[in-house]
Amino acid sequence: MTKQILPSVIKLITPEQVLLLSEGLVAGVDEVGRGPLIGDVVTAAVILDPNRPIAGLMDSKKLSEKRLQALYLEIMDKALAVSVGRANPSEIDELNILHATMLAMSRAVAGLNIKPERVLVDGNRLPEFALNAEVERHAIIKGDGLVPAISAASIIAKVTRDEEMLQLDARYPEYGFAKHKGYPTKTHFEALAQFGVLPEHRKSFKPVALRLLS
């Protein structure tokens, strides 16, 4: 009989718990891009190799651009498995950003070429994963700064999405995506007012919706 392990949300985690949860084939999962007005929400799932440790893993938001790029390359080289999942603006508009993020996380885990024994997600919610019941799954609040596999996932997701914003900037340089990465800044609002809504904008987000009505 298959043993079912109930999912949980972990609010406080000790260093000892981090070590225990990091044993075996652990997939860390995180997202980048819930707040921007444009583009996909990007998620990543990473299974690290315990025999090839990576120093300096932490929340991607606390890393310099140079360090981000270096860690991205090291993760891609050393990890046992890396998968990126995304939800596009149409899916975000249809589902809302929370459910679209959960969908993207599910896609990231489904894309792993190694089956994890445990899935650890940053935050306080767990997606519906297409996994067997015996696979542990936990949401860890502020996990991107605590659990190495989640930190690695946050780095992969951020570098991936930032690169996509650079590509968008090359197509629409007047919007300034290289600088603000699609977030709701003054520059972005001014570009929306002057140049209008792009196909890649999230039409359900209020600043974009208001511009469509004007």
From Swiss-Prot:
Residues binding a divalent metal cation: D30, E31, D122
GO CC annotation: cytoplasm; ribonuclease H2 complex
Enzyme class name: hydrolase
Assigned EC number: 3.1.26.4
RNase H type-2 domain location: 24-214
Pfam families reported for this sequence: RNase_HII
InterPro entries on file: RNase_HII, RNase_HII/HIII, RNase_HII/HIII_dom, RNaseH-like_sf, RNaseH_sf
Gene3D superfamilies: Ribonuclease H-like superfamily/Ribonuclease H
Necessary cofactors: Mn(2+); Mg(2+)
GO molecular function: manganese ion binding; RNA binding; RNA-DNA hybrid ribonuclease activity
GO BP terms: DNA replication, removal of RNA primer; mismatch repair
Subcellular location as annotated: Cytoplasm
Role played: Endonuclease that specifically degrades the RNA of RNA-DNA hybrids.
Family assignment from sequence similarity: Belongs to the RNase HII family.
Stored NCBIfam families: PRK00015.1-3, PRK00015.1-4
Protein's UniProt name: Ribonuclease HII
Organism: Shewanella denitrificans (strain OS217 / ATCC BAA-1090 / DSM 15013)
